[in-house]
UniProtKB/Swiss-Prot annotation:
GO cellular component annotations of the record: plasma membrane; proton-transporting ATP synthase complex
Domain of life, per lineage: Bacteria
Self-association and partners: F-type ATPases have 2 components, CF(1) - the catalytic core - and CF(0) - the membrane proton channel. CF(1) has five subunits: alpha(3), beta(3), gamma(1), delta(1), epsilon(1). CF(0) has three main subunits: a(1), b(2) and c(9-12). The alpha and beta chains form an alternating ring which encloses part of the gamma chain. CF(1) is attached to CF(0) by a central stalk formed by the gamma and epsilon chains, while a peripheral stalk is formed by the delta and b chains.
Lineage per the UniProt record: Bacteria, Pseudomonadati, Pseudomonadota, Gammaproteobacteria, Pseudomonadales
Membrane topology summary: Multi-pass membrane protein
The organism of origin for this protein: Pseudomonas entomophila (strain L48)
Protein name per the record: ATP synthase subunit a
CDD domains documented for this protein: ATP-synt_Fo_a_6 (cd00310)
Disulfide bonds: none
Matches recorded under Pfam families: ATP-synt_A (PF00119)
Keyword DNA damage: no
Function: Key component of the proton channel; it plays a direct role in the translocation of protons across the membrane.
Molecular function as annotated in GO: proton-transporting ATP synthase activity, rotational mechanism
Length: 289
């Protein structure tokens, strides 16, 4: 790796491949964290975009292949897996979502599978994908992060998409008046009109904070858990690079132990993101507060 010290190695692994406008006015890839920061809002994390798109296409390809090979006879391994996953998601939706909307189950399945696939990249040894990217580009200083869900931009983008659906269905089901009523007439209400008017700003503040917290809690929960998991793998890799045989032996044990734990974590985080999405959309379909 281009970074020789432990701190440099860690920082290198935590920096995205960023494309944007350089200080001289030209457009290109950032070669330092300072350059990436200077690019401002219109900077693109190419690695995050590429891998999230790749995992989305992988999800579509796997499920399309399973659908094409589906048979009424003895199902194959992929068909069995897809059927179990679909039944699991369908059962979760039926138990949690109390409205009627044909979009919810496919959306929940897409979220779970896509987030799981993006999370699962974290199980690949931390140096493999960056080293391949460096070899292909010919740039030994290339920044490259392969796990999209360790980038808050990716998790926030997904959660904001869910948030948009919450707003759309809240207005569609309850009407604009009903939606605004939820924000201004609850949780405090009074039969006295003057007092109710006085309570409107208080209600709006409380309900607006609750509403706006939903996408941020979704995004930060997924990002925080995956970022921490990635950091643990990087720290274990630093132990390998220390050059001490006994430390490398401990690192081997820790790597396998953490990988086994992390399989549970990446699955759990995909499940939580899916379930919270279902819960929030179910609340958006409820007529009463």
């Amino acid at each position: 790796m281009a970074a020789e010290t432990a701190s440099g190695y860690i920082q290198h692994h935590l920096q995205n491949l960023t494309y944007g406008q350089l200080p001289d006015g030209s457009w290109g890839f950032a070669h330092s964290a300072a350059e990436a920061k200077a690019m401002g809002f219109w900077a693109f994390h190419v690695d995050t975009l590429g891998w999230s798109l790749a995992m989305g296409l992988l999800f579509i390809w796997l499920f399309r292949m399973a659908a094409k090979r589906a048979t009424t006879g003895v199902p194959g391994g992929l068909q069995n897996f897809v059927e179990v996953l679909v039944q699991f998601v369908d059962s979760s939706v039926k138990d949690t979502f109390h409205g009627r909307n044909p979009l919810i189950a496919p959306l929940a399945l897409t979220i779970f599978a896509w987030v799981f696939l993006m999370n699962s990249i974290d199980l690949v040894p931390v140096d493999w994908i960056p080293q391949i990217a460096m070899a292909i580009s010919g740039d030994e200083h290339l920044f490259f992060r392969a796990v999209p869900t360790t980038d808050p931009n990716a998790t926030l983008a997904m959660s904001l998409s869910v948030f948009a659906l919450i707003i759309i269905y809240s207005i569609k089901v309850k009407g604009l008046g009903g939606f605004l009523g939820e924000l201004t007439l609850h949780p405090f209400s009074s039969k006295n009109i003057v007092l109710q008017i006085i309570l409107i700003p208080v209600n709006f503040l409380l309900e607006f904070v609750t509403l706006i917290a939903k996408p941020f809690s979704l995004a930060l929960r997924l990002f925080g858990n995956m970022y921490a998991g990635e950091l643990v793998f990087i720290l274990i890799a630093v132990m390998f690079g220390a050059g001490l045989l006994w430390l490398s032996g401990i690192a081997v044990v820790l790597q396998w132990a953490w990988a086994l734990i992390h399989i549970f974590i990446i699955t759990l985080q995909a499940f939580i993101f899916m379930m919270l999405t279902i819960v929030y959309l179910s609340m958006a379909h409820e007529d009463n507060h």
